[in-house]
């Protein structure tokens, strides 16, 4: 259910864009992200930092898009969010306080070296996605960017999540692997 809620704003953004335009879709994205926070809090009595950061970025860049009637702001939002995720993961790893380990370490006990590999993998992934977003957003038609944002980045994230799970599974202690079978 939680994962479905995470996709709600994206689905609404895409649908509204297809029927209207980027400006109405940006307003819908702000509203849908606020609704996502409200529903998530109502169901789980907790909000994750990632959701709050995303909401703040959506609100700021969505509002700038509407006020200045310039879609460049909503396009930059994607790159800035990915850059923030890459920086947060990279800095936490440099400080030996892996965010990924703190999120998943209780369920999956693997060596710190493995957490470091995964963290740097995601740093590179987020940085690359941010750079590719800049290219697609400002070199290709708006419709191509919307499709890339909704389908391309979502698919890439899902594929990288699967790769991460398999990599973690490969390095789990034998007793933990048996529990997962």
From Swiss-Prot:
Keywords of the record: Cell inner membrane, Cell membrane, Membrane, Transmembrane, Transmembrane helix
GO cellular component: plasma membrane
Chief localisation class: membrane
Residue ranges crossing the lipid bilayer per the database entry: 10-30, 50-70, 72-92, 118-138, 148-168
InterPro entries hit by this protein: YciB (IPR006008)
The keyword Cell inner membrane belongs to this UniProt entry's keyword annotation: yes
Subcellular location: Cell inner membrane
Cleavable signal peptide: none
Domain of life: Bacteria
Cystine pairings recorded for this chain: none
Record's bilayer topology term: Multi-pass membrane protein
The family this protein is said to belong to: Belongs to the YciB family.
Function noted in UniProt: Plays a role in cell envelope biogenesis, maintenance of cell envelope integrity and membrane homeostasis.
Database matches in HAMAP family: YciB
Protein name, per record: Inner membrane-spanning protein YciB
Species whose genome carries this gene: Shewanella sp. (strain W3-18-1)
The organism's taxonomic lineage, starting at the top: Bacteria, Pseudomonadati, Pseudomonadota, Gammaproteobacteria, Alteromonadales
